[in-house]
């Protein structure tokens, strides 16, 4: 019989075996055992209060549902006391995006800022009082207006009683303010029927009395421009003015009291240039020195900045005063300068004290300038830079580059007077910049006259001409004599070479007719040339190996092969450094497999790249490499296996192969292993030598050659027992003599 599938059970034929299948027809309404249909309590339109509260099944069906599963999340989905229509249940099953949106108009106007403003108005009532100046602040006026608007909008609260049998309920009702400002009633019923107004009120008792406490509040005068802060300085472009608050909104400007002149710095620079003036062009046409003196005269007296402002002085006055400054040539060697200002006279006095070299003045030791360390100076076209380190200023000993202005602030902070700045900078420049030495001029050395030179030249000329002529004749005669031999061409041939490595030698032709001495000499020269080539090649390889010893490229570092310990060292270095990948030289398949095992135990990833003899192992780090330690117990086992791995893409020389300690087979002749019948064992063994320790002990005990090893009277045999080789199976008594 064919097997029926489960979907046949839901077709109504036969008894349903599936729990999920539903019968056809009126299956949604459960039939009562009395013949009627039971009401679906989940879709009941009656409140639970109208039902039977004593029936636990009805309460359970209402809250949790009888058709729902025990573990269903839909149980308890209805609120008590709510009507559940069929439409609401249908919409409840829909997703949120498909449910209809309902808009409900609020019964009250929600305005939290309005109540907050009213509280602030009551709290700041003392601002409404007039100030000492006789006017009210704008803030108090605005707050009062807002308070009046709030009082107009606020409505009275009525306490109403709804008559019932035994209870009275007080309801606080507020009118709803529409968008146009008109009040609308919540119902169309009459006020007399809905509300009850208590006209008597409540009696005032002692408990309802609220005690009030008078608190003295300090009056605060609010200014019109209270938001503006007073700043003591005013900057306009590059000009900075000091201000004072005069009160009552007035501001005063502080004028500088110190004397100031716009050309003060210019005149001071001119005077310094005049004092330091030194020129090499002060010579006339005949080479005599021209003595000059300069005099700078000025009849203008400097005024303060206040006098300039009051008198309304202009720049033209200063231009006329500058015209009076003249430089005149006066015979004399002294340089004179006359100035009427006090500032320049003081500056000259400072310069006189500042001309002393740094370290020879008492002012140099007033501060702690020795804590400023200057390690280098960069000289520029306009400004210089200094490499300075000062723990007192920066809090550390690290040097940094600073400019001239910052350097002046540092040395001033360390206590060096201003008039010693120049000497300090000279001291720094002399310590770092070496003065160029002028080349020596030999102007004082007298030269010979022309007459003496002519006389010496006349004496040398005849001798030189005679020698030159003789040499030319000899040279011409020698060239003509051997001219024919120079054009002769000689036929050269190279000798043949036979052998490899150290066995290379020359092959001489018997028809060449060479002597034995010449042949031996050529053989020695050829051997020397081969040795020199080998030395040069080894020197080149040693140089390359030393240069690539610290290289990260293993193909250059190991040109012929590497040891098992080298592989471990490379993995250790790669594990500690910041590189992410490494490539090993191409080895044989077993060597590449060993490198893969090393990578696995170091928690790295190994992959083969290339084909054939150029197959290399590419190793890269992974996330596990950082958080795991290598398995050194397994790595130590790998070190005990195959020690040497040669590269398969390079052919190593014979001398290099010996450096890897390769095992070499010994070529032993096979004759020693052929043992014949009747051969005496140890027949060819040598006699025990004198160096043997056992023989020397016996000789000290009195033993001599030819004696036995026994005691006196029983020395034993003098010769050892001979042992013969027996290879056939004929027996011990069978010998070759018996066969005969």
UniProtKB/Swiss-Prot annotation:
InterPro entries: G_patch_dom, R3H_G-patch, Splicing_assoc_domain
Biased composition (Acidic residues): 146-159, 435-456
Comp. bias intervals (Polar residues): 133-142, 162-190
Cellular localization per UniProt: Cytoplasm; Nucleus
GO biological process: mRNA processing; RNA splicing
GO CC, alphabetical: cytoplasm; nucleus
G-patch domain sequence ranges: 690-737
Keywords, alphabetical: Cytoplasm, mRNA processing, mRNA splicing, Nucleus
Domain R3H: 561-623
GO molecular function: nucleic acid binding
Positions with biased composition (Basic residues): 1-22
Superkingdom in the source lineage: Eukaryota
A Pfam family it matches: G-patch
Sequence segments annotated as region (Disordered): 1-52, 67-93, 126-191, 435-464
Extent of the signal sequence: none
Family: Belongs to the SQS1 family.
Main function: May be involved in splicing.
Name of the protein in question: Protein SQS1
Species: Kluyveromyces lactis (strain ATCC 8585 / CBS 2359 / DSM 70799 / NBRC 1267 / NRRL Y-1140 / WM37)
């Amino acid at each position: 019989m064919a097997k029926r599938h489960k979907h046949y059970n839901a077709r109504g034929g036969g008894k349903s075996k599936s729990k999920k299948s539903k019968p056809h027809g009126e299956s949604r309404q459960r039939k009562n055992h009395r013949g009627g249909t039971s009401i679906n309590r989940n879709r009941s339109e009656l409140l639970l209060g109208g039902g039977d509260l004593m029936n636990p099944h009805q309460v359970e069906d209402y809250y949790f549902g009888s058709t729902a599963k025990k573990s269903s999340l839909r149980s308890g989905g209805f609120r008590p006391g709510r009507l559940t229509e069929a439409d609401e249940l249908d919409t409840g099953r829909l997703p949120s995006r498909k449910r209809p949106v309902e808009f409900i108009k609020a019964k009250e106007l929600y305005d939290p800022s309005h109540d907050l403003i009213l509280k602030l108005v009551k709290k700041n009532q003392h601002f409404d009082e007039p100030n000492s100046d006789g006017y009210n602040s704008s803030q108090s006026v605005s707050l009062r207006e807002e308070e009046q608007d709030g009082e107009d909008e606020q409505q009275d609260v009525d306490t109403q009683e709804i008559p019932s049998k035994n209870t009275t309920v007080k309801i606080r009702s507020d009118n709803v303010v529409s968008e146009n400002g008109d009040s609308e009633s919540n119902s169309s019923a009459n006020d007399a029927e809905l509300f009850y107004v208590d006209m008597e009120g409540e009696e005032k008792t002692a408990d309802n009395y609220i005690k009030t406490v008078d608190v003295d509040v300090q009056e605060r005068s609010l200014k019109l421009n209270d938001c503006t802060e007073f700043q003591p300085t005013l900057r306009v472009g590059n000009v900075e003015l000091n201000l004072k608050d005069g009160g009552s909104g007035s501001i005063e400007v502080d004028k500088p009291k110190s004397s100031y002149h716009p050309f003060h710095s210019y005149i001071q620079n001119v005077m310094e240039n005049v004092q330091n003036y030194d020129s090499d062009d002060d010579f006339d046409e005949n080479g005599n020195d021209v003595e000059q003196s300069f005099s700078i005269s000025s009849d203008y007296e400097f005024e303060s900045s206040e006098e300039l402002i009051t008198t309304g002085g202009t720049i033209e006055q200063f231009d006329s005063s500058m015209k009076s400054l003249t430089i005149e040539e006066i015979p004399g060697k002294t340089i004179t300068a006359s100035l009427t200002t006090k500032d320049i006279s003081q500056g000259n006095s400072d310069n006189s004290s500042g001309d002393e070299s740094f370290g020879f003045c008492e002012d140099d030791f007033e501060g702690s300038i020795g804590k400023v360390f200057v390690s280098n100076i960069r000289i520029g076209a306009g400004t210089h830079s200094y490499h300075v380190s000062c723990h007192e200023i920066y809090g550390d000993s690290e040097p940094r580059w600073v400019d001239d202005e910052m350097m002046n602030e540092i040395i001033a902070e360390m206590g060096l007077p201003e008039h010693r700045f120049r000497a300090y900078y000279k001291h720094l420049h002399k310590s770092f910049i070496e003065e160029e030495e002028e080349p020596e001029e030999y102007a004082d050395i007298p030269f010979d006259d022309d007459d003496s030179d002519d006389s010496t030249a006349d004496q040398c000329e005849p001798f030189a001409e005679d020698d030159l002529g003789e040499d030319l004749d000899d040279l011409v005669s020698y060239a003509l004599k051997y001219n024919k031999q120079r054009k002769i061409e000689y036929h050269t041939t190279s000798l043949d070479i036979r052998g490899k490595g150290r066995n290379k030698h020359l092959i001489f032709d018997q028809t060449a007719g060479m002597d034995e001495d010449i042949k031996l000499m050529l053989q020695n020269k050829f051997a020397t040339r081969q040795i020199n080539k080998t030395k040069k090649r080894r020197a080149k390889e040693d140089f390359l190996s030393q240069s690539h010893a610290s290289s990260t490229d293993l193909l250059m570092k190991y040109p012929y092969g590497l040891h098992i310990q080298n592989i471990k060292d490379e993995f250790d270095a790669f594990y500690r450094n910041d590189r992410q990948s490494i490539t090993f030289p191409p080895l044989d398949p077993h060597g590449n497999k060993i490198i893969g095992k090393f990578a696995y135990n170091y928690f790295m990833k190994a992959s083969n790249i290339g084909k054939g003899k150029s197959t290399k192992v590419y190793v890269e780090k992974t996330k596990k490499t950082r958080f795991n330690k290598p398995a050194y117990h397994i790595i130590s086992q790998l070190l005990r296996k195959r020690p040497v791995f040669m590269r398969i893409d390079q052919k190593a020389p014979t001398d290099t192969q010996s450096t890897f300690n390769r095992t070499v087979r010994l070529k032993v002749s096979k004759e020693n292993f052929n043992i014949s019948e009747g051969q005496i064992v140890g027949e060819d063994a040598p006699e025990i030598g004198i160096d043997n320790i056992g023989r020397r002990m016996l000789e000290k005990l009195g033993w001599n050659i030819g004696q036995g090893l026994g005691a006196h009277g029983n020395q034993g045999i003098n010769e050892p027992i001979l042992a013969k080789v027996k290879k056939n199976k004929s027996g011990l008594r069978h010998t070759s003599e018996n066969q005969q």
